[in-house]
């Protein structure tokens, strides 16, 4: 789409997702067996024919670079690019100090591409969004800035920017991560929150970034600094995400923040529901990613019993023998020996599980090897002595770990 530049913020450290982010940036964390978190933001752009995209990285970005090189290479197509951009300290010897600073340090890309509008989106949420519809709203309102927003229970809104709007969709109030979020008038218990997705008129964006960069007391963040300064000037509008329609889908919009181990696990369980609120199978809104050349998954009975796969996703290259898999997601090359019982668990790929293992509500990172007869998630008090266990009782096995040997 001419006149539009996409910039995706993909530098998140993801400290609340540890140990999954010990060796990778948050947007590179695998999801849904076949994908990485970054894929959902990229698909929202590509499916909307927005094909000039810079992906701004910072922490532990090598696996993200490799994934994008293999799965998102559009080089050779005139005026189309999806380019990862490492932090380069272009404006001084410092890393990005906030979301606005990340864009400011790369303002030269905006100047050189000369877009009319700049779409700045995050990369660590699970959702589908036709950005064209938000862009149409932005243009209709002739806004300097449009912020996408959704409704959520006020009790859960303190981790987000909370918005107030008038009857025309104009922003009249904004508070970043308030301790006591304001509810929508007439909707007790419900708050309107920012999704962290912005469309700027390019000239206004550059003006605000340059002004903010000169302020010593600024945290150089869109939510903390840029939006609170801009909305009183009267040209900031709010796009209601619930009005966004995806071709080929009839369900209500789905959006999930996967910033914690619990929410990451819950989002996977959403995929496995009988009427899943988030579908991976809409041919009219395909979810592109890098898919390695692997043989189909293989299921075989064994002397210990028949293989049972119930309400689960199993990726290519996997081999499961005489075991029971229920409500679980198994990534590429999952190797499950016989007589195992795995439920409500997530295996991120290239995982080996020995004979007779029991896994309950476990996340196993790539390359882990679990010894025969190991039980994880059955006795949480014992698990806490050996593994990372979240407050909600989700056990996480780190990347490459050898367990039970």
Curated annotation (Swiss-Prot):
Pathway the protein takes part in: Glycan biosynthesis; glycogen biosynthesis
Top class in the EC scheme: transferase
Keywords, in A-Z order: ATP-binding, Carbohydrate metabolism, Glycogen biosynthesis, Glycogen metabolism, Nucleotide-binding, Nucleotidyltransferase, Transferase
Domain of life: Bacteria
Pfam families per the UniProt record, alphabetical: Hexapep_GlmU, NTP_transferase
InterPro entries: ADP-Glc_PPase (IPR011831), ADP_Glu_pyroP_CS (IPR005836), GlgC_bac (IPR023049), GlmU/GlgC-like_hexapep (IPR056818), NTP_transferase_dom (IPR005835), Nucleotide-diphossugar_trans (IPR029044), Trimer_LpxA-like_sf (IPR011004)
MF annotations from Gene Ontology: ATP binding; glucose-1-phosphate adenylyltransferase activity
E.C. designation(s): 2.7.7.27
Sites where the protein binds alpha-D-glucose 1-phosphate: 96, 161, 176-177, 194
Family label: Belongs to the bacterial/plant glucose-1-phosphate adenylyltransferase family.
Function in brief: Involved in the biosynthesis of ADP-glucose, a building block required for the elongation reactions to produce glycogen. Catalyzes the reaction between ATP and alpha-D-glucose 1-phosphate (G1P) to produce pyrophosphate and ADP-Glc.
Subunit structure: Homotetramer.
Protein name: Glucose-1-phosphate adenylyltransferase
Protein species of origin: Aliivibrio fischeri (strain MJ11) (Vibrio fischeri)
């Amino acid at each position: 789409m001419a006149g539009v530049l996409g910039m995706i913020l993909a530098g998140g450290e993801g400290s609340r997702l540890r140990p999954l982010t010990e060796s990778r940036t948050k947007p590179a964390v695998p999801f849904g067996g076949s994908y990485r978190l970054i894929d959902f933001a990229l698909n929202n752009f590509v499916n909307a024919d927005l094909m000039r995209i810079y992906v701004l990285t910072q922490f532990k970005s090598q696996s993200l670079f490799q994934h994008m090189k293999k799965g998102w290479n559009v080089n050779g197509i005139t005026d189309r690019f999806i380019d990862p951009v490492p932090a380069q300290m272009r404006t001084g010897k410092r890393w990005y100090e906030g979301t606005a600073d990340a864009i400011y340090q790369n303002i030269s890309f905006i100047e050189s591409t000369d877009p009319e509008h700049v779409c700045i989106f995050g990369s660590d949420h699970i959702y589908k969004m036709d950005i064209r519809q938000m862009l149409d709203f932005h243009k209709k309102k002739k806004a300097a800035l449009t912020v996408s927003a959704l409704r959520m229970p006020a009790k859960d809104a303190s981790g987000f920017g909370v918005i107030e709007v008038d009857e025309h969709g104009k922003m009249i109030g904004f508070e970043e991560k308030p301790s006591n979020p304001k509810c929508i008038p007439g909707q007790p218990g419900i708050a309107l929150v920012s999704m962290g997705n912005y469309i700027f008129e390019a000239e206004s964006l550059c003006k605000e970034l340059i002004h903010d960069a000169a302020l010593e007391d600024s945290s150089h963040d869109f939510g903390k600094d840029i939006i609170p300064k801009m909305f009183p000037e009267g040209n900031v509008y709010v796009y209601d995400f619930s009005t966004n329609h995806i071709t080929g889908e009839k369900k209500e919009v789905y959006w999930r923040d996967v910033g914690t181990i619990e929410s990451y696990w819950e989002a996977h369980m959403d995929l496995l529901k009988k009427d899943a609120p988030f579908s991976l199978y809409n041919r009219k809104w395909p979810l592109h990613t890098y898919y390695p050349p692997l043989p189909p998954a293989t299921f075989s009975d064994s002397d210990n019993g028949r293989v049972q796969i119930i309400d689960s996703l199993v990726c290519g290259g996997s081999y499961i023998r005489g075991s029971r898999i229920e409500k679980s997601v198994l990534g590429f090359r999952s190797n499950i020996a016989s007589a195992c019982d795995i439920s409500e668990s997530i295996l991120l790929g290239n995982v080996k599980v020995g004979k007779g293992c029991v896994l309950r509500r476990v996340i196993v990172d790539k390359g882990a090897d679990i010894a025969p007869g190991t039980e994880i998630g059955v006795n949480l008090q014992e698990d806490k002595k050996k593994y990372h266990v979240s407050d909600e009782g989700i056990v996480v096995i780190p990347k490459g770990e050898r367990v039970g040997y």
